[in-house]
Amino acid sequence: MAKRANWSLDGQQSSGGGAASWICACTDKISIAKALTRSLSVMLSRPTALLRTGARWRVSLTASGRSTVRCASTVAGWQGGLSWPQGKQPTPYEVLGLVKTGVDARQLKKRYHELAKLYHPDTAGAAQQGLGEHERLRRFKLVNEAYALLSDASRRRMYDMYATGWAHGPAPMAPAMAHGAYHERYAYYNAGTWEDMQDLNSDRQQVQFSAWGMVVWALCMLAGFQVMAFLIRLEERTSKSAHTHEEAEHALLLAHLNYGLDQDRVSRVRRFLWFRSWGLYRTKAELDEAARTNEALVRQLEGGK
């Protein structure tokens, strides 16, 4: 039999002879046709499932001439198909269905084009007809914002470090907290020896102890102020009691010595006259008469002033 043209596995024409080569080539073509027919029938029968899962069918041939059909729903750097994340606050990586550690510019751009065509209000596919216009527009905006953030290297770096630049996720940390978290991560991942790790742990304990020291210091100051206020009030009360006692003793002494008379000139004259009358007279009538006479003398003395 004359030499026939044979087809290799990659689709290029190669020379071969013999009926066996020709039969193998025909068998390969029939296998390829059957595989393509099966894959097309599956894709046409379940378009919604394929769009939801993002499955991609590929026909490949083995070295022995057998054809196989594989469904690859995931590739390196992808979380899954075109399904939308279930969380209420998805990250830009979750919106685009990408893994944080395995994203390159080519995959990012390809994924963005797929999702943009899927959720664009004017070109939404049959799989997205169940979504309202507002929901499709919201998802389309999230896809655009996620692509704008991840395609910019500086914005993406800031988001990975401090979770800034993305308004649809959890609230970012304050600058002071973010700086502290970055410093702790840097110190942890750059600790080369056990001594560095020990120093890192001791620094954390020192910060914790210093915080407790501030609390104890504040409590001691408050207790000191309370003790000082108590001592001041106690001293005032003791001084007032002592002063009252001294005044009472002085009044009692004056009462014993002067019989209720004061220390001025007129009081001293009245006291002198009273003691003199007490020594001269014995009867009540005589004492009363002497008292009236003494009082007249005292009044004359006061009038003479």
From Swiss-Prot:
Main function: Probable chaperone.
Annotated GO CC locations: mitochondrial membrane
Q: Where in the cell is it found?
A: Mitochondrion membrane
Chief localization: mitochondrion
Tell me the InterPro entries matching this sequence.
Answer: DjlA_DnaK_co-chaperone (IPR050817), DnaJ_domain (IPR001623), DnaJ_domain_CS (IPR018253), J_dom_sf (IPR036869)
Membrane topology qualifier: Single-pass membrane protein
Entry coiled-coil feature ranges: none
The organism encoding this protein is Eremothecium gossypii (strain ATCC 10895 / CBS 109.51 / FGSC 9923 / NRRL Y-1056)
Does the record bear Chaperone in its keywords? yes
User: Where do the TM regions start and end?
Assistant: 212-232
Question: What Gene3D superfamilies does its record include?
Answer: DnaJ domain
Q: What is the top-level taxon of the source organism? A: Eukaryota
In Swiss-Prot or TrEMBL terms, this protein is called J domain-containing protein 1
Question: What are the alphabetically sorted keywords of the record?
Answer: Chaperone, Membrane, Mitochondrion, Transmembrane, Transmembrane helix
Listed Pfam families:
DnaJ
Family that this chain belongs to: Belongs to the DnaJ family.
Question: Which SUPFAM superfamilies does UniProt cross-reference here?
Answer: Chaperone J-domain (SSF46565)
Entry's PROSITE patterns?
DNAJ_1, DNAJ_2
Q: What is the lineage of its organism?
A: Eukaryota, Fungi, Dikarya, Ascomycota, Saccharomycotina
